[in-house]
């Protein structure tokens, strides 16, 4: 696993964070050291797939990055009569995802598309995964995407939505942010790396509160919604049709 050192030296003109070649190369290390509970979420996605994915249906991973979620799903399927569709708008991510998926033999077909997830038709879906993806879309586009997902899910289909959260209580918000930064420092990131990455992300990662997510999911059509995992200001929700 290549180590993330992208923000280890001072960057004079710090642009917005993008999922470019340099990020794709170190992404597994970056996300493990940056997102508390990421491995637990990936493991649980497989458990949910085991329970919810049905024969003859499709599974979508929207914002699939290098394919960790897809592999977890595929390992846990009860049938190979399923198609998994992974979508990411980063060509470097897609190339590595295809290579990663192809390194493991399976009879379950997987299609990896380089596209904007807003352009993808969702149909005959038993499971849709949005793993730290929605927060990178413009807020104005989020309800439309979730509504499309709801309509594309079969009855008893599941959406897994993992996000970084904001909190309305200022003291709690500051505490959880500080704990997250402590987590990153404990994983070897310097103060400079934490600061520069935060600055690079502030215009492209627009986070919402848990309440906002729940309200939006209800507007999209879901009625069974629950936060099933949280670690500091990161977490994951499930919504069942």
From Swiss-Prot:
Alphabetic keyword roster: S-adenosyl-L-methionine, Transferase
Keyword DNA-binding: no
Parts of the chain that traverse the membrane: none
UniProt keyword DNA repair, yes or no: no
Superkingdom assignment: Bacteria
Reaction(s) the record says it catalyses: prephenate + S-adenosyl-L-methionine = carboxy-S-adenosyl-L-methionine + 3-phenylpyruvate + H2O
GO molecular function: carboxyl- or carbamoyltransferase activity; S-adenosyl-L-methionine binding
GO biological process: tRNA wobble uridine modification
Coiled coil spans: none
Binding positions (S-adenosyl-L-methionine): 38, 63-65, 88-89, 116-117, 131, 198
EC number: 2.1.3.-
PANTHER family to which the protein is assigned, alphabetical: CARBOXY-S-ADENOSYL-L-METHIONINE SYNTHASE (PTHR43861:SF2), TRANS-ACONITATE 2-METHYLTRANSFERASE-RELATED (PTHR43861)
Function: Catalyzes the conversion of S-adenosyl-L-methionine (SAM) to carboxy-S-adenosyl-L-methionine (Cx-SAM).
Quaternary structure, from the entry: Homodimer.
Family stated for the protein in its record: Belongs to the class I-like SAM-binding methyltransferase superfamily. Cx-SAM synthase family.
HAMAP family named in the record: Cx_SAM_synthase
Designated name of the protein: Carboxy-S-adenosyl-L-methionine synthase
């Amino acid at each position: 696993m290549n180590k993330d050192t992208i923000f280890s030296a001072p960057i004079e003109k710090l642009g917005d964070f993008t999922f470019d070649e340099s990020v794709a190369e170190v992404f597994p290390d970056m996300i493990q050291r940056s997102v508390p509970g990421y491995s637990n979420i990936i493991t649980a996605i497989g458990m949910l797939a085991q329970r919810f994915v049905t024969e003859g249906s499709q599974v979508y991973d929207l914002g699939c990055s290098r394919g960790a979620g897809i592999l977890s799903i595929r390992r846990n399927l009860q049938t190979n009569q399923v198609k998994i569709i992974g979508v990411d708008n980063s060509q470097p991510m897609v190339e590595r995802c295809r290579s990663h998926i192809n390194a493991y033999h399976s009879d379950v077909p997987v299609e990896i598309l380089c596209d904007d997830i807003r352009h993808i038709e969702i149909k005959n879906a038993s499971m849709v995964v949005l793993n730290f993806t929605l927060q990178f879309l413009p807020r104005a586009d989020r309800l439309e995407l979730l509504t499309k997902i709801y309509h594309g899910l079969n009855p008893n289909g599941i959406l897994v939505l993992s996000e970084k959260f904001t909190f309305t209580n200022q003291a709690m918000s500051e505490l959880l942010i500080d704990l997250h930064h402590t987590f990153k420092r404990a994983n070897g990131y310097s103060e400079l790396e934490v600061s520069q990455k935060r600055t690079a992300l502030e215009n492209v990662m627009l986070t919402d509160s848990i309440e906002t997510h729940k309200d939006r999911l209800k507007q999209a059509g879901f009625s069974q919604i629950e936060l099933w995992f949280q670690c500091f200001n990161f977490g994951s929700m499930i919504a069942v049709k």
